[in-house]
Structures are given as structure tokens and as C-alpha cells.
Swiss-Prot record:
<dbReference type="GO" id="GO:0000049">
    <property type="term" value="F:tRNA binding"/>
</dbReference>
<comment type="function">
    <text>Hydrolyzes ribosome-free peptidyl-tRNAs (with 1 or more amino acids incorporated), which drop off the ribosome during protein synthesis, or as a result of ribosome stalling.</text>
</comment>
<keyword id="KW-0963">Cytoplasm</keyword>
<feature type="site" description="Discriminates between blocked and unblocked aminoacyl-tRNA">
    <location>
        <position position="12"/>
    </location>
</feature>
<dbReference type="GO" id="GO:0004045">
    <property type="term" value="F:peptidyl-tRNA hydrolase activity"/>
</dbReference>
<dbReference type="InterPro" id="IPR018171">
    <property type="entry name" value="Pept_tRNA_hydro_CS"/>
</dbReference>
<feature type="binding site">
    <location>
        <position position="68"/>
    </location>
    <ligand>
        <name>tRNA</name>
    </ligand>
</feature>
<dbReference type="InterPro" id="IPR036416">
    <property type="entry name" value="Pept_tRNA_hydro_sf"/>
</dbReference>
<dbReference type="GO" id="GO:0005737">
    <property type="term" value="C:cytoplasm"/>
</dbReference>
<keyword id="KW-0694">RNA-binding</keyword>
<dbReference type="InterPro" id="IPR001328">
    <property type="entry name" value="Pept_tRNA_hydro"/>
</dbReference>
<comment type="subunit">
    <text>Monomer.</text>
</comment>
<comment type="similarity">
    <text>Belongs to the PTH family.</text>
</comment>
<feature type="site" description="Stabilizes the basic form of H active site to accept a proton">
    <location>
        <position position="95"/>
    </location>
</feature>
<feature type="binding site">
    <location>
        <position position="70"/>
    </location>
    <ligand>
        <name>tRNA</name>
    </ligand>
</feature>
<keyword id="KW-0378">Hydrolase</keyword>
<dbReference type="GO" id="GO:0006515">
    <property type="term" value="P:protein quality control for misfolded or incompletely synthesized proteins"/>
</dbReference>
Length: 194
């Protein structure tokens, strides 16, 4: 099992986006930063906000790209190259249309499912999709045409409550992952439903 060395939370930068569904990945990074009592700081050379936590297996970097979502790979690629972090040592948290609110799942590899942030990260890692993901369920609007507006919209209070519960549990599972490995964390998170 690879030791995770970089955890990325995908988001659009700027206050008008911070409460939108597409920023669910950043919500998880904020939760992990809170657990480890660190603050993310803007780092221009990594095109994002960065923090360092000390976990059982060594240093782990947290990253929220401050590029637009579809340029997330620029930040991930810059940081991964600088610290020589391999794709399988990266965990990317992102919003997931194919899971309902209140559910989050860990998986390795797979396509980008139309997610432009994931698409750009795969390209920036030399077309490797071998990184791990935490897929945070946001639900689906029902029709493809509605997706763009939906991901940039805010969840209903009921959905937000469920997403928050899944993000909290995902935060606990990331802590477990850093201590006990990916399998235990995956089994626990993938069984959770708010």
C-alpha cells in the first residue's frame, strides 16, 4: 500500500463559489486542516492554498488549487513534481454526481466521469489516473443539461446537512487512512450513509 503524501480538495476559487456543490472537495480539506490544527496558506508556486500535516507515515501536504476547477492539474502537477509525489500517493477529494448526498466513497483509478477537475489532474500526471479519490456525493439533477448549473448551485439545507455529515465521516476516515492504511478507511467510509 502506498503512503498518501498529498491530499487535494477540488474547488472553484472565490467567495461566490465557496458554498456551491462543486466545492465539496475543499470542505473535506478544511475539515482535515481543522482536525490537525493547521491553516492553509496561499503558495503562488503551487497555484493553491497549502498546509503540511504530520501523520503516522510522515509529512502529508494538503492542497486546494486556487485556479479554476478545469485547471486543477496545474496546482497538483506543480506540487507533485516539486515533492516527487507519485500518482498513487495522491488522494483527491471531489464532488460526485453519481452518489447521493450523505454518501462518500474512496476508490483508486477510474475515469473522470466528466469532472473537469479530475480530467485536468489526469492530464497533468502524465495521463495517470492511478491516484485515489474521495468521492463526495452531491446527487444528480436528473438531466445532463442541468449539471453545469447544478454543481455551481448551493445544496438545499437538508442536502447540506447530509453532505456535511459525509464530509465529517470522510475526515475521520482520512485520519484512519493515514494511521492504518487505505483498506480500513475505504471499508469504513464506503459503508457510511447519513
Amino acid at each position: 500500500m502506498s503512503q498518501i503524501k498529498l491530499i487535494v480538495g477540488l474547488a472553484n476559487s472565490g467567495t461566490k463559489y465557496e458554498d456551491t456543490r462543486h466545492n465539496a472537495g475543499e470542505w473535506l480539506i478544511n475539515e482535515i486542516a481543522r482536525q490537525f490544527n493547521v491553516s492553509l496558506k496561499e503558495e503562488a508556486k503551487f497555484f493553491g492554498k497549502v498546509a503540511k500535516i504530520n501523520a503516522a507515515g510522515g509529512e502529508v501536504r494538503l492542497l486546494v488549487p486556487t485556479t479554476f476547477m478545469n485547471l486543477s492539474g496545474k496546482a497538483v502537477g506543480a506540487l507533485a513534481n516539486f515533492y516527487r509525489i507519485k500518482p498513487e500517493e495522491i488522494l483527491v477529494a471531489h464532488d460526485e454526481l453519481d452518489l447521493p448526498p450523505g454518501v462518500a466513497k474512496i476508490k483508486q483509478g477510474g475515469g473522470h466521469g466528466g469532472h473537469n477537475g479530475l480530467k485536468d489532474i489526469i492530464a497533468s500526471l502524465g495521463n495517470s489516473n492511478n491516484f485515489y479519490r474521495v468521492r463526495i456525493g452531491i446527487g444528480h439533477p436528473g438531466s445532463k443539461e442541468l449539471v453545469a448549473g447544478y454543481v455551481l448551485g448551493k445544496p438545499s439545507p437538508q442536502d447540506q446537512e447530509k453532505i456535511n455529515a459525509a464530509v465529517d465521516e470522510a475526515g475521520r476516515c482520512v485520519d484512519l487512512l493515514l494511521k492504518d492504511g487505505i483498506t480500513k478507511a475505504t471499508n469504513r467510509l464506503n459503508a457510511f450513509k447519513a
